[in-house]
Amino acid sequence: MKVAIVGASGAVGQEFLRLLDERNFPMDELVLFGSERSAGTKYTFRGKELTVKLLQHNDDFKDIDIAFTSAGAGTSKEFAETITKYGCVMIDNSSAFRMDDDVPLVVPECNAEDALNRPRGIIANPNCTTIMMVVVLQPLENISHIKRIRVSSYQSASGAGAAAMAELQQQYKELVETGEVKTVKKFPHQLAYNVIPQIDVFQPNGYTKEEMKMYNETRKIMHTDAKCSATCVRVSSLRSHSESVWIETEQPISVEQAQQAIAAAPGCTLVDDPTTLTYPMPMDTAGKDDIFVGRVRKDLSDENGLTFWLSGDQIRKGAALNAVQIGEYLIKNR
């Protein structure tokens, strides 16, 4: 088994390196690819020094079985044929192919079997906020069909990349030293001591691209007709996203039923005890694999409504871990 990482020097690429090692991913060889800027960079993996190769239109992928790609939608579109033409399976972390009818969009806890039907040799990894939500929705859907979803996300700076994290830290430093923020490049407004109710660009319907991803991707992954309305907000934490989720189901689900289903579901950890002020928070979920769920309660305005809070590391389960789990599923089912 020969595996590649495309975009090895990025935040998600680095997480791929850590996870492939941590999970003892079965492979004989790992090959790293990157842009001209990162080509030549060296990383250590399982005691061996690996050098990032320049991603080019050549036959480098001829003997590679699985490629984890995380170098942006433009790169994925440009190099998809080069990567897949000899049979390599491309597990893509970008938005390039997510809504293509002939590309499965997969979260293993929900629709792992979809990964086996890949006409173009490409499997798409969903958006981080979508992944985190559907992992929790699936066990509830198994009890009663979800008709409607409303979600507000609280997304950390790292969701916009490593440079965005650095900018947030720089903004705090500037506020302490001078009392004003001078560095605003990665966000539309100052993020320090602030929240920004915009992630990605606005669409003609008034929603942002990020919000429409949650609507479209949730329906595709879960094979559902559920309506989903999202508001995505950037907050001034560094890592891990959180979401406040409300659902309406065909039949009522009790709090106890929901808690039991979530606690038993793969990829979920229930953290829900108001008597001890115990609930998920970004500072406690960073670096962890599961999605943590709490504040489970009945909606006071709808007997078929349920609401809950979740938090999880969007770089792990929201990106690299989900892709690695897809790869593991393919190996088990080849």
PLM region spans:
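N-terminal Rossmann-like NAD(P) cofactor-binding subdomain of oxidoreductases
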Residues: 1-191, 227, 291-292, 296-302, ...
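Charged docking surfaces used in two-component/phosphorelay signaling
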Residues: 67, 157-334
